[in-house]
Amino acid sequence: MEKTDHIFHYNNTLTLEAGDTLPGFQLKYTTLGKLNHERNNVVWICHALTGSSDFTGWWIDLFSEKGPFDPSKYFIICANMLGGCYGSTGPLSINPKNGKPYYHNFPVITNRDVVKTFDLLREELKINQIDVLIGGSLGGQQVIEWAIERPDVFKYIIPIATNAAHSPWGIAFNEAQRLAIEADPTWKENDARAGIEGLKAARAIGMISYRQYETFGKTQPEKTFDKLDHFRAATYQRYQGEKLANRFNAYTYYLLSKMMDSHNVGRSRGSVTLALKNVKAKALVVGIENDLLFPTSEQKFLADHLPDAKLEVMTSLYGHDGFLVEFEQLTQIIKQFFKKISNDVLAKHTHAPLNINA
């Protein structure tokens, strides 16, 4: 079964949470599978910070015949978030007001703005119910935000390695990365490659938070004792910076890191705990044991305060990045979650079991 790419155009003014507006926007989105007659067999994916709508590049194991979400049975969709650089409106897009790229003039956006655009796409596709909403890290923040904003839309949510409000620790890591971008003398230029050397340094800083002590010890050890320079860990960091710089831009990285910082579901809703009570979906909250950036205490908080939630914790050498690496663990956790629901339903003799591969 082949994936398909699409563009959603919204031609009306979009009012943003911070008070600014966008004179319309577009979202690139990727789909796999077909909508059923009831249009409710939908699995919607929210991608992470530097991700795209092409979930087959990073989560295909979950969306395969042997995975928990078989595309012959589900309609799977992922949209590149507003502010992104993979086909959706972002800082390198043309501002229709002046015919030039936005660059530094792209407005401040929040996760609340992003899920508003997702919801407009959902309405355009005439999808009234989403069976499963899943995402990790920044995408997991959007899962929580959207489930609060539109509680009647979602049946199940799976927020992974994420939180209800971004922590001072996480904000500090992001600010260190933005300082690296700002230190690049080209950053203030209006050019698509502005700040690109700073972006490389920012990515290297970020990698320290995405991984952990044991990750580097196991994957980047020195094989000799006589080296004085060009250590494997150092060259690995440079490699990661170069790799991101070849596919991303500093404007988007800066913008989306600010968006992550502003994540707080309690804003204008009384409190974080009050906001979480608004969620009606049954939740599978997944944490990663050695996650430095989103420690498991944050997922425990979510599970404790969402009305109907189960917490599962993965183990991974790769820390926060484990949600992009530990496919077998994640697959089994998701399958077992739905298997238990199916068994509970059978025990009550109310309706047929869910269509999940065991």
Language-model features, listed with the residues they occupy:
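Catalytic-loop region of hydrolases
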Residues: 1-42
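N-terminal cap/lid subdomain of alpha/beta-hydrolase-fold enzymes
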Residues: 30-96
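Conserved acidic catalytic loop of the alpha/beta-hydrolase fold
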Residues: 101, 105, 112-132
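Conserved hydrolase catalytic core segment
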Residues: 129-168
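Alpha/beta-hydrolase-fold enzymes
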Residues: 153-155, 159-243
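Short alpha-helix in the alpha/beta-hydrolase fold that links the catalytic acid
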Residues: 268-272, 281, 295-304
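Short beta-strand/loop motif that positions the catalytic acidic residue
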Residues: 279, 285-287
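Catalytic active-site module of serine/aspartate enzymes centered on a nucleophile-bearing elbow/loop
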Residues: 300-301, 308-358
